[in-house]
């Protein structure tokens, strides 16, 4: 990997929010891509996940989720809401930087380490950022160099021979690949390998 795990999170936050800022004046109450959530609800989901992953690395529970829940103010204008996403990304990236390699924490998709939680956070930022961009009719694609480490870390059985972004979108049930139909159900594997 040519980018550090913390820089992956920071860059995913910056790239996705910069793309979404171009749609700040659009209707954020519409659905985010094929999700049932609105663009605003999806932002809160991203914040919840990314802040939660930082909290898991800090608290290090072995059998439960943490009790801190982060969200975006539903009344905040889009630029301020996106600032909240960048803050969440910075919190996770800083936590990844300061967490020792041997630390493990609970997650329902497998106890994980700092690299796993960084990849989970980047996935939330990138994939849901794309969902929102699609809902706002913005032209934005996940950069392959950000998708590749996420696929490598969270989807050990991912198909090979495709662009990393296409593979990530297939792994998360967003698209079909040649000879592989779109997935109806999916989950990542955060376990340490």
Predicted features by range, described:
Residues 45-46:
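Glycine-rich loop at the start of a catalytic domain that most often binds anionic cofactors/ligands
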Residues 42:
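Extended, alpha-helix-rich binding/interface surfaces that flank or overlap catalytic cores
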Residues 1-8, 12-15, 22-35, 52-76, ...:
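Structured surface interface patches that mediate subunit assembly and partner/cofactor docking
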